Amino acid sequence: MTIRSLAKKIIAYTIEDEYKVYRLRKTKLRIRIRFTGKYHKCFDHETICPNKIVFDNYMGNGYGCNPKYVLKRLLEMPEKMTEGLDLVWITKTPELLRPILPARVRIVLYDSEQAFYEYATAKLWVKNFQMVHLLNQGLLKKPEQVYIQMWHGSFGIKKIEGDCGYLNADKAWLALAKKNAAYTDFWISNSRFETEVYKRAFWGAGKILEYGHPRNDLFFEQDQLQYKRKVQEAYGIAPEKKLFFYMPTFRDQDHGLLQPLPYEKIAEALEMRFGGEWVCLVRLHPRRVSREQIEALKEQAVMDATMYPDVQELLAAADAMVTDYSSAIFDFMLTKRPGFILAEDYDAYEQVRGFYYPLTDTPFPLAKTDAELLEQIRIFD
């Protein structure tokens, strides 16, 4: 048992208004700490910069998803239309993004005091995740600020936020998640289905705009091969090789190492069915990334694409894809290339997290074992 899990057994933690409340279980002893105090002290006096926009992709992970493609479009516009805009990208890896982003985009380290200053003074927040972690550190939204939530999912397979029973059992998380939802001014949806999910999962989400996801614009560009060339160059893959992309999601209650697939057998099955020589790329979910997991991937017959900045480019480059419960496969569907679902823990995952619909209702061949996946590849029609 870890120290953290032991502490949870002894101490109950929740949120009450602007206070963290720690209670020793089975006693009346309570400690209340105003978690917004530091933020009030440091940033309440700061004025809003009307031309500042802060972008953040999934808690500072890479340069991708919907925030990237909004920023990309701004940078493509005539300079006279965007002159004076202060564009800020928040990231955990500034050193990786400096060669990618133009000089006019300021890069700020995620979770730093500078990042909180940027949030405090920006007119517009463009994000694709719940800011529970930042709110837990005291982040506050001022009335004159605008928060656009673009989300990172698609036609969600797994249940999210308010639709997920076990998440709602965490009272501290629930209080901050509801606060995040109340802060949000606009939600960007890709469909009626997603709109209905937003309304339920985000506690009566406010103004929902069915504009589609900006990140999927790249699938409709004329030169689709540019992304394959870019990925092949990044990983030293020969131009004639085909790319198989494995993108598993996380497990809420399992932080162990990702079970490897029979990658060599998968490559053989793909070669038998579709021809060509295949290379396997694996991308870990940000919540599964660890030093041990990265080291484990090095020992397998795969390319580790976890740190590649933009997953959409990987999707555009791939010739075939496998996931378990990541809705990214619906984005990949826009390529009209073969996609497969490998759900080895289907029943357990459904019980803990839950699905919005049976996976058999999707257009993707479903396998529950490695052997079934190999067979689904061989008979793919």
Predicted region positions:
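Short, conserved loop/helix-junction motifs that constitute active-site signature segments
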Residues: 138-144, 179-183, 271-275, 335, ...
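A nucleotide-sugar donor-handling region in carbohydrate enzymes
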Residues: 23-38, 157-166, 170-254, 286
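A short beta-strand/loop micro-motif in the catalytic core of glycosyltransferases
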Residues: 125-126, 184-191, 281, 321-322
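Extended catalytic core of nucleotide-activated donor transferases of GT-like folds
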Residues: 68-72, 77, 101-170
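Donor nucleotide-activated moiety binding/catalytic core segment of transferases
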Residues: 107-122, 286-330
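Catalytic binding pocket for nucleotide-activated donors in carbohydrate/polymer assembly enzymes
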Residues: 297, 320, 327-381
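N-terminal pre-catalytic "stem/leader" segment of glycosyltransferase-like enzymes
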Residues: 2-116
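Conserved catalytic-core segment of nucleotide-activated headgroup transferases in glycan assembly
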Residues: 63-76, 201, 213-295, 367-369
